[in-house]
Amino acid sequence: RTTFYNNIKIKGIEETEAREINGLPEEAQLSNFNWSPDESKMAFTNTIENGVQVYILDLETATAKRVTEAFVNANMGNPISWFKDGKSLLVNMLPATRKELINTAEAVPTGPTISTSDGSKAQNRTYQDLLQNPNDVFNFEQLATSALVKVNLDGTSTLWKDAAMYSDVSFSPDGKYIMTSTIHKPFS
């Protein structure tokens, strides 16, 4: 579950007043805050009606700038990692090959509903957030799959690693290596 913030301000240790940030989106839903390695900038996401965007906040000028369209995949943890040089980000983006999700309320069942002899549904154990049928598996795959894209501070981007179900992306302390963890079938 994600906590969203509708505004941020900055205040230096020696400053008495917090400064307003220029360039924040209207009706902001901000999350996934991430400091640059030199701590002069901060990357964060803004969730809008049709997706998630990445913004960069320059702390010296107190100005935020959007650097991606609403194609960020923030479904599996923090979608933003800074490269060691602080000049670019590694961002989990929706792949171009992403398919439409199956509407499970309208989908035709793939098998029978198990019921007791009196016609009521059989009592089964209930667990939260489990994949219960092939439609759930398909939807999970679509929601969890990201392409890793290198996004520069000016908003230009290049594909860094092809689409997979990345559960974690982390840089080594010296910034020379990146470890990615992926999820593979079968899921349980």
Model-predicted segments: where are they?
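Predominantly soluble domains enriched in secretory-pathway, periplasmic, or organellar proteins
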Residues: 19, 59-60, 74, 86, ...
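Hydrophobic beta-strand positions in blades of beta-propellers and related beta-sheet-rich domains
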Residues: 7-10, 54-56, 67, 146-150
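Surface-exposed loop/turn positions within WD40 beta-propeller blades
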Residues: 5, 49-51, 61, 145
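Predominantly five- to eight-bladed beta-propeller fold
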Residues: 1-7, 94-149, 184-188
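Blade-loop segments of beta-propeller domains
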Residues: 1-37, 71
